[in-house]
């Protein structure tokens, strides 16, 4: 990267985009973020934004070179490095990712006939999107590269995930764009490190990166589903202890202990979506997605097993806390929260269910479930 080029643009500064912007600003870059939500932008401008994502409010209050705009032309013209971080949800009914917002952004860039820029897609896309659709949508942009650079982060720990990643995945449009992206991430690495030790970057084709992103997440979902399956087997086997069994399995260096714990089914905005998306993509290229279909089935089956176990306890009141989609997550994300789905099934079975959680999470639950449960706000 041209070491004198210090400006970076981010199109879409939602939860992930804002965290990226803050880390880039802390690494020494001048960052301009774009969004369409005027009120949200104003809170960022006056640094009054309240975020449940750890460290965001603190880093925002200390930032000096982060600005935001709702002027699309301004953010595009601000730099030659344009990151795009917009939602690509699964479109429902086991269909593919909804690339509508991303498509619209690329269409707008093409209508401006941008040139001499690097466009970097951060949001998750289906394999083949970059070169089959993305490049077509930017066909009028001269000397402009299209790159894929998905983040491997966890909601509720995004800043830490960006500052201390297991790896940086770069699906480079050209060697030059790959080098510039590597330079940018190395500056982020230096925020918490004095040398290059531990800096792991994987540069490859966009197609390889698209598959890698899904493959990593889906390996984790399979490991979680397998762990719960083994745990359920132990529960049905007198004399066995699921925690001892899983701990021993994790000692094998070929397997490792991460994500090898008994608990609730996996949920959230990414894991279920990516598992289904990889299965759907497999079918389009003629490979039967046996593993991903089985993982999804095991995950749902485990939820049903746990529900029956709770139901058989026949409690007077069923109390649940920590209702976000994963354990110890203070961010109000309840999408496909297994614990919440079990609570709903218990309530539907006529059981009294009390939800104890923080106000922000309870407010989110009430939006979807109303008075299905009784609630108690806790710290």
What are these regions (language model features)?
Residues 2-379:
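Structural/interface elements that position substrates and couple domains in central-metabolism enzymes
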């Amino acid at each position: 990267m041209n070491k004198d080029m210090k400006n970076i643009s981010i199109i879409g500064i939602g939860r992930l985009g804002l965290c990226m912007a803050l880390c880039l600003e802390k690494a020494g870059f001048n960052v301009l973020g774009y969004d369409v939500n005027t009120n949200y932008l104003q809170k960022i401008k006056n640094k009054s934004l309240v975020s449940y994502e750890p460290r965001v409010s603190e880093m925002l209050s200390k930032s000096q070179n982060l600005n935001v705009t709702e002027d699309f032309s301004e953010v595009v013209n601000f730099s030659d490095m344009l990151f795009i971080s917009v939602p690509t949800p699964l479109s429902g009914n086991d269909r593919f990712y909804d690339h509508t917002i991303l498509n619209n952004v690329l269409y707008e860039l093409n209508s401006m006939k941008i040139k001499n820029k690097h466009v970097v897609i951060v949001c998750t896309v289906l394999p083949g999107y970059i070169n089959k659709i993305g490049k077509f949508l930017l066909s009028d942009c001269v000397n402009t590269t299209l790159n894929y650079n998905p983040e491997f982060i966890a909601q509720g720990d995004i800043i830490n995930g960006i500052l201390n990643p297991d790896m940086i995945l770069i699906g480079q449009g050209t060697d030059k764009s790959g080098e510039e992206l590597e330079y940018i991430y190395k500056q982020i690495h230096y925020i918490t490190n004095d040398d290059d030790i531990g800096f792991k970057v994987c540069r490859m084709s966009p197609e390889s990166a698209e598959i890698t992103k899904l493959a990593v997440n889906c390996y984790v979902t399979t490991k979680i589903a397998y762990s719960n399956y083994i745990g359920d087997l132990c529960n049905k086997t007198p004399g066995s202890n699921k925690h001892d069994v899983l701990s021993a399995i994790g000692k094998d260096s070929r397997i490792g202990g991460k994500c090898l714990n008994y608990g609730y089914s996996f949920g959230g905005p990414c894991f279920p979506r990516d598992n289904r998306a990889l299965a759907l993509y497999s079918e389009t290229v003629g490979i039967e997605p046996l593993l991903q279909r089985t993982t999804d089935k095991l995950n749902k089956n485990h939820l049903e097993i746990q529900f029956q176990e709770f139901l058989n306890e026949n409690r007077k009141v069923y109390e649940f806390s920590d209702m976000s989609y994963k354990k110890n997550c203070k961010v109000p994300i309840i999408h496909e929260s297994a614990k919440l789905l079990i609570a709903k099934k218990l309530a539907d079975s006529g059981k009294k269910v009390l939800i104890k959680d923080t106000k922000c999470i309870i407010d989110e639950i009430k939006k979807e479930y109303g008075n299905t449960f009784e609630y108690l706000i806790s710290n």
